[in-house]
From Swiss-Prot:
InterPro entries registered for this protein in UniProt: PM/HMP-P_kinase-1, PyrdxlKinase, Ribokinase-like
Keywords: Acetylation, ATP-binding, Cytoplasm, Kinase, Magnesium, Metal-binding, Nucleotide-binding, Phosphoprotein, Sodium, Transferase, Zinc
GO CC annotations, alphabetized: cytosol
Protein's recorded name: Pyridoxal kinase
GO biological process: pyridoxal 5'-phosphate salvage
EC number: 2.7.1.35
Stated family: Belongs to the pyridoxine kinase family.
Cofactor note: Divalent metal cations. Zn(2+) is more efficient than Mg(2+).
Assembly notes: Homodimer.
UniProt function note: Catalyzes the phosphorylation of the dietary vitamin B6 vitamers pyridoxal (PL), pyridoxine (PN) and pyridoxamine (PM) to form pyridoxal 5'-phosphate (PLP), pyridoxine 5'-phosphate (PNP) and pyridoxamine 5'-phosphate (PMP), respectively. PLP is the active form of vitamin B6, and acts as a cofactor for over 140 different enzymatic reactions.
Pathway: Cofactor metabolism; pyridoxal 5'-phosphate salvage; pyridoxal 5'-phosphate from pyridoxal: step 1/1; Cofactor metabolism; pyridoxal 5'-phosphate salvage; pyridoxine 5'-phosphate from pyridoxine: step 1/1; Cofactor metabolism; pyridoxal 5'-phosphate salvage; pyridoxamine 5'-phosphate from pyridoxamine: step 1/1
CDD domains: pyridoxal_pyridoxamine_kinase (cd01173)
Amino acid sequence: MQAGSWVVGGGDSDSRVLSIQSHVVRGYVGNRAATFPLQVLGFEVDAVNSVQFSNHTGYAHWKGQVLNSDELHALYEGLKLNNVNQYDYVLTGYTRDKSFLAMVVDIVRELKQQNPRLVYVCDPVMGDKWDGEGSMYVPEDLLPVYREKVVPVADIITPNQFEAELLTGRRIHSEEEALAVMDMLHAMGPDTVVITSSDLPSPRGKDYLIALGSQRTRSPDGSVATQRIRMEICKVDAVFVGTGDLFAAMLLAWTHKHPNNLKVACEKTVSAMHHVLRRTIQCAKAKAGEGLKPSPAQLELRMVQSKRDIEDPEVVVQATVL
């Protein structure tokens, strides 16, 4: 399912990404968190900003505008009229509006008709768990759209545990149940599923969280092989915004480079995340001062400062093949 060409250390990529996500003037979420890493890794990125806010909504105040489905359609029509709507990848993240999400699906379907090898990477942002209890932070009417329209056209999805449970209607209490949920998600459409975080216990203790991945690869003879992995990721004692957007963008890049090796793609993605977050928390604590809690502004991802780690991450998190 992978498209284009990619060369480590030089050479232009032929791959072009249409990224439909939020935008902030200050900070790194949505397209701001995805565009720079993808460009550093050799991709052309065309960004549609689903919202334009002054900053992310974790601050005390924010101002801005929201793009509606008609405006999204108009932007896409402009690309189409000029015959510049050829893409290898589509990347989407947080969306609050049902009609906007349906328009995204229409665009993806049309692009896939033009290029059957196009890969759609979807982070189905709907909610999360706090202290074991899950809650949605988007309108509930988005769930059936994700289930019935979005996931079936996606090739790679990156839900957290709660979102995977929402999509399948099945709770996860064990690794075996998580693997079964990923199989259910495969059956809905995507060949690659990564559950980016879970509340499953880690053998390494409470300071680690478990992430799981599953990738189905089809051989020319029609046979299907499945690679499943588990990763134990050291927790960072801070609340960051934009990490899911960064994760999805880097997973797009590294699955492109390693199309049939989810283990390596996830190791590089998670290791790069580790370096970015470590640098961010160190800088935030230094700016806040000893014993003081860093502010949202101080916890903005140190993206530019992490360019080398994004480009060529030292692998510090190993994945286990299950």
